[in-house]
Amino acid sequence: MASTFTSDTLPADHKAAIRQMKHALRAQLGDVQQIFNQLSDDIATRVAEINALKAQGDAVWPVLSYADIKAGHVTAEQREQIKRRGCAVIKGHFPREQALGWDQSMLDYLDRNRFDEVYKGPGDNFFGTLSASRPEIYPIYWSQAQMQARQSEEMANAQSFLNRLWTFESDGKQWFNPDVSVIYPDRIRRRPPGTTSKGLGAHTDSGALERWLLPAYQRVFANVFNGNLAQYDPWHAAHRTEVEEYTVDNTTKCSVFRTFQGWTALSDMLPGQGLLHVVPIPEAMAYVLLRPLLDDVPEDELCGVAPGRVLPVSEQWHPLLIEALTSIPKLEAGDSVWWHCDVIHSVAPVENQQGWGNVMYIPAAPMCEKNLAYAHKVKAALEKGASPGDFPREDYETNWEGRFTLADLNIHGKRALGMDV
């Protein structure tokens, strides 16, 4: 079945591939509407549970302390709660004063190298299908602050804890090493007080069209595409490390497998100030994957999916999921926020923002063959101060003063870049 439409590279005629895919999957699934209705009922129960908690003022996001992670005191119940919700907040991941110091050092780094004078505007249109403006993203990767956080013991401990929530061994194969994560350099967000922003519409990353057409994703989502939804486990890593997103040149993609996306707060954050929201239901990806197979979606479309863009989730096609969007709680600088790689997320709009909204994006990307290959490219980019391969080639930092260099790597950093230590 899969060989009739799957492709490791972007099909020349992706709309024809979508039509072929729908024909094959409908034949395989049988009564798609009945399967989708049952899934919708299950998801609706979860949505009601989430919204009841919100109405009572109870926490939806699991919150744990870094001290408990470090001491090995996280309970089985807390682990299960993270797996049920697909997200977590780590309080006190870094001391607040250290995070505020990093924030100031980022500003000093930008000012010293006259970033405002040399900045040429956004280098990509990755979020182009979403209703909203871009958050204030700076294409900076190699500041001391970012790299110190990435190679810190605190980050390594948190990443290992999160990676171990997954099933990473099956059928005699270890899909990844949970205790070493590669450095995945990403950008920073700096959003000043008084900002008015449209935010960012609900979406998922790690492939859009790919989730239907890639052979590896067909294996990842086999139980969704064959209708065995009760057997689908979003926490099983089998075949996820074999996924290679389509190459659409000089835009944003993700060449690594991330167990969790994440960011670390560099400022305190108040509710209602343009914060991250998620749909805290990891299984909602099954709803997203099956929805385009229903009769009301044009035969060559996937509910707004386009090559080289994020996967949009919208009120038009996914109203049940949008209903469950849930904000992160109040944060302090030094707290970190994490969400499963399939989890739908958005950034809320804000008018006249109170306080700063500054973060550095640092995910959990455990060591495996795919991630090691990218880590070697990261090392080469670090040597030159170049933009990493997954991002537009803007290369602002090549001659910047004060940027992080190979000589600044500690043992965690060297291990995370696949260097012999």
Swiss-Prot record:
InterPro entries registered for this protein in UniProt: Gig2-like (IPR010856), IPNS-like_sf (IPR027443)
Name of this protein: Uncharacterized protein YbiU
Lineage: Bacteria, Pseudomonadati, Pseudomonadota, Gammaproteobacteria, Enterobacterales
Gene: ybiU
